[in-house]
Amino acid sequence: MERTLIAPGVHLSCDPASKFNRCRISIHFAFPAQRKTATAHALLPLVMERGYADCPDMTRLTKKLAKLYGADLTVDARPMGCNHNLCVSVTGIKDAFALEGEALTAEYTKIALGAAFHPYLVDGCFDPQAVSIEKQMLKKGLEDEINDKRIYCLHQANREFFGDSPAGVRQEGYLEEVDGLTPAMLTDVYRQMLRTANIELLVLGCDAAQTAAIRDALLAELARIDRAPLPLVENMAMPAIAPVHKTETY
């Protein structure tokens, strides 16, 4: 896979993957994890996945994806060491398999860029109704974590081991902070992400011309943003300490 720098803090990785019948366009936003914004960043992908400016609700978005032969849009977040990684990804069949010769890759590009750079806003902020719904979903996920003892123990061990260091930030969010999140707060962390994140554009299953068109479309979006990418935090090693045994009861 070829990886090239296409703008400050922006890389393109591509592979034509000619043996497969599907393609994928993924936009990764990577930035240092911070304790004060961890819960907002955990909620952000849940709200972004519900739709964007041209498809402001899940019904319209589902219909649009269905017309593209069952394409799939996902917006998720995952830890990346001491950094946070939010990914917007669209997957679907290649143009060559479209029954009527539709330019599917161009449509996938519009959806990916729409979800990443043109969210559905109400009075300049994320839709309050969508934020309220996804706050409940995030709360439920955090409350249910304790019922999965293996995952809970892994997360707790990670928090105890790394403590207050950047690697110890609970990137899935903090239950006690969810209720306090507002659409304005979520919009602020979203805009900060656009300004400061390192961006990885991953294009799989597209030819050179399609890849160039996707690259140019992304660069056009970034040209409208006053970008100042932050350096990512390197993986860290904690000092050796004596073993500690922790017991929790409920």
Model-derived segments and their meaning:
Residues 13-15, 21-41, 58-114, 137, ...:
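M16 family metallopeptidases and their MPP-like homologs
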Residues 110-121, 219-229:
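A common structural junction motif
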Residues 167, 171-177, 192-250:
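An aromatic/glycine/proline-enriched structural segment found at the starts
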Residues 42-49:
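Active-site SXXK
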Residues 51-54, 96-99, 118-127:
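Short, polar/flexible loop-turn hinges at active-site or ligand-entry regions and domain interfaces
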Residues 62, 118-142, 229-239:
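Acidic/histidine-enriched alpha-helical segments
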Residues 1-9:
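Short, Gly/Pro- and small/polar-rich lid/capping loops
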